[in-house]
Structure formats: structure tokens, C-alpha cells
């Protein structure tokens, strides 16, 4: 069936929270193929948000129209897409009928083909939760990375999968910022986030003088599909930089806790030795795995050399991976960090023939609009 053209409509205010939805908004039915799942969606919400609201966990990443994790194909129906990056869905794809579900609103009953999905996750993922937390620690890790530790208060626990992220709500506003958890469910009394401080950033300002130990912060989540795929056996390559350490550390902690026997090569990119952190714990976690290597990739300076039994290479992280991983086309690759690093890594993987279904990534974008 040929795709229907996308209709253009004025921008909509949206949220998956039931209390913010318009009870009189027109409703439509969405049928997802090839999984044969049907749900209801209102004209006041994005399709991805409607899925979250009804416990359907579609593949997704940024939820801001910047990545392509939720890209799908409209088989039938009228859909409008707004406020998205053409790098995630270009004009030719839009003309063909592709949409990003995180930025798409339905104006009729629709049939949508899911291009990326995990059958085990669709109806069995972790539910989205609203959690009231209390700040228990704010600790600088480097000159621009801060560890923020939150203790769940109401409810008293927070369920998530290693590698996922949460929305942290900025107190006194309706705004939020998204950050990945570095911890696992083995520490139910606290959740740790590793946050990069950007000049002028609103959350960075909070970390400087806006919040203190004992203050409350609301979070919503978990989100994201940057998780270990159970039952997979391929070697794993982790490539990270900056605050991209958080989800990779969560994955590594989880693998150590569960006795995972897969091979892991972990490459972390930084400018100088002073930009490295959590190295001792990473090496300790690695000693509990079957086949683990950690390589620090320093792009600007090797002086002074890092202390301890750590492998260090000179150069950008993607260049180091290219030299050391000739068989990366036969590995599952997890990428997390600044967009230029992720884009360079994706080019490397494409050149080496790594299948797309073996690549999982999160881009940590800076809040330039602040």
C-alpha cells in the first residue's frame, strides 16, 4: 500500500502525562505492523508519548527528533511531523512516508510499520514512573563532569534497565533535562547521574549553586533502548566520551553483577589524563569479567601519564578503535558521547561493514539553545 502524504498542522503542546492531556481531543486508532499491536492516540500528543502512556515500549532514543531510533513507515493514515532534524529523517524519506514517532501526531486512524522493534520489550518493558527524589551527593569527577546522586523518596524505589536515561525536572520550571543512569538496580537506595557542565546551561547552573544535598528533584523515566540484548553472544565494543561514561558504566556494572561472559573492549575518549575518572572501578569490574580490555584514548596530551595498570593510546577514540579493532564488523557496538564522536564512530562502523542491528548509540547533545 502506498503511503499517504504527510499533512501539515500548527504545532501542538504535548506531554505523555495523563493530567496534561486534553480530554476532548479527537482520538484515533494506531495499528503497528508487523507486531499486530493496536492503541489509541489523541491529536494532542505525539504517537511515542501515547505508546508510553499505554505501556507499549516502542524503540526510541532521544525523544527530540534528533536520532532515528523511532523511525517508522506510514502505511496508511494522515500524520503530521514537526520540530525534527533532517539528519534523523531527511526530505526524501519523509516524501516516501517515513516518520519519527517522537515527533508525529495522528489525524486519522493509521497503520504504521515499525522498522526497529524488540518483541520482548514491546509489552514487557519497565513502566514510565514519576519519582520524587532527594539529593544525597554532588561530587566533581573532573573539571566539567559532576556525579549527582539521588535517593528515591516517593515511591521509595526506581525501576530501570542498565543503559536507560531519565528526565530530571528543573525545580520551579516546566523544563527538564535528560541524563543517563550510571548505577544499576543493585543500589535501590540511590541513582547516580554523570552530568557534563556546559557554560550557560541551566542544569549546570543548578549544580554550581542552585541545588544542595537535601533538596528535592523530580524525575520521570526510564527511557531509551541503550540496553544489553539478552541472549546475544557477539563480542561487545564500548565507545564513549564525556558524560557518555554513565550508561556504559551502568552496562559494565550490570555485566559484572550478573556474571556475563561476553568479551568487552571499552574505549573511552578524553582530552587529557585529568579528564579520566572511575578508572579504578572500571578495572576492578573488568577483573570479574571473562575477557575485558579498557583503553583510555587521549586526544590532546598524555602528560602526566595516568597512574595504574591502564592502557593508554594517543589520538581520537575512533582512530584508536580503527587501529585496534579490525574485526569490529563482527561485534555489537555501544556508542555514547558527544555527537561528533558518535558520528565519526558510525562512519567507521559503516566502513567496516558492521550491520546496523549490531550498533546501539546515544548522542549526548549540548543545550545550545540555552
Swiss-Prot record:
Q: Where is the composition biased (Basic residues)?
A: 1-14
- Quote any Pfam family the record assigns: FAD_binding_6
User: Does the record bear Nucleus in its keywords?
Assistant: no
Cofactor(s) this protein cannot do without:
FAD; [2Fe-2S] cluster
Q: Kindly list the positions annotated as binding [2Fe-2S] cluster.
A: 62, 67, 70, 102
Q: Subunit comment for this entry? A: The propane 2-monooxygenase multicomponent enzyme system is composed of an electron transfer component and a monooxygenase component interacting with the effector protein PrmD. The electron transfer component is composed of a reductase (PrmB), and the monooxygenase component is formed by a large subunit (PrmA) and a small subunit (PrmC).
Role noted for this protein:
Reductase component of the propane 2-monooxygenase multicomponent enzyme system which is involved in the degradation of propane via the O2-dependent hydroxylation of propane. Reductase catalyzes the transfer of electrons from NADH or NADPH to monooxygenase.
Record protein name field: Propane 2-monooxygenase, reductase component
